[in-house]
Amino acid sequence: VHSVVDYVSAAEHQVYPWGINDPTEGNRTTLHLPWLKTLSTDWHIDGKGWYSTTRGNNAIAQENPTGGPEYENNYRPKSPLFIFKYPYSKAMTPPSSYRDASITQLFYTTNVYHDVLYILGFNEKAGNFQINNWNKGGVGGDYAILNSQDGSGVNNANFATPPDGQPGRMRMYTWNASIPERDGCFEAGIVIHEYTHGVSNRLTGGPENSRCLAALESGGMGEGWSDFFATAIRLKPGDTRATDYTMGEWASNRPNGIRKYRYSTSLTTNPHMYVDADGLTSVHAIGNIWASMLYELLWNLIDKHGKGDVTKIRPVLKNGVPTDGRHLAMKIVLDGMALQPCLPNFVQARDAILDADKNLTQGSNKCEIWKAFAKRGLGVGAVFNLSKRTGS
């Protein structure tokens, strides 16, 4: 047993590291466990055993070429020495030729994100995804099932979120708008976007009720939260509020990504306002508006509190409050999800974020939050009406 523990503690994963969104931003490297000390367990341990494959307490990752519901007996890489190093290049084809690298990348990105969210408050009591909750609250038995190269679709991805105690399921697809086709597992923003659906569905209305984002506007905000976290996590050291970001650009092979507008604090580059949601029937279109507001919030808080060292994975907290504006924005947005009602609208979600900041910092960021929302028409006088919103 001692030798197995030694191997696990020295596990290696060859991946695009945290902060590199896709193959255009950097190179793969070999990383060693552990990166983060959280209250959850090791990535390859669940309290019942050690797994010399892409399985652990937080996630189980495998290929799923048929697109079917089975996963436990599906193929996943195995390494008795816990060395997960496999070849991949953008020129390799077909995708099945690099399935080991794809599964390993998906497993890595998801586990890092789990640990970051844990520090920010998405833990066992909040309804996170873990097999073993270590008697810390919530319901266990629900790691995230991660399907790489899932055969049930293309040019997309999804995450199914049942109530706490039942595993979530992420399906990652290949994208065929380029030659060779591209694997969404190598675009971290897509993985983070999908996992965040699990987070927002578990937090809104409580972990026992995962249907609280089922309405059009709340579902749209679900897409927006997912884009927001994917974007906040990929910030670079030299970024400023003048930096714009796309969503899904690499996988889709579209220079402007898969949203109508880039995420930008410029009203010229991204003119989205609250009232633009009138008449929209697409949750992704509504989400583009909501995430644009959150991007304003992100930069208002960064300008006030600094960006921190974005090359470091672990959020730094003092008395439970993130010390940098980036993680502070992520924290109050997370906390707001838990405070808002079931089936919230933009106004209610905005108010929940204000309440979250009041609970966390005694409201010291109230002005920055109001300015962010008011800039895009969700100020003090904004009123929700599904067909005719009032901007302010």
From Swiss-Prot:
Pfam families: Peptidase_M36. One of its GO terms (cellular component) is extracellular region. It comes from the Eukaryota. Its EC number is 3.4.24.-. One of its GO terms (biological process) is proteolysis. The active site is at residue 194. Its cofactor is Zn(2+). PROSITE patterns: ZINC_PROTEASE. GO terms for molecular function: metalloendopeptidase activity; zinc ion binding. InterPro entries: Fungal_virulence_M36, Peptidase_M36, Peptidase_M4/M1_CTD_sf. CDD domains: M36. Glycans are attached at residues 176, 359, 385. Belongs to the peptidase M36 family. This is Extracellular metalloproteinase 4. It comes from Trichophyton soudanense.
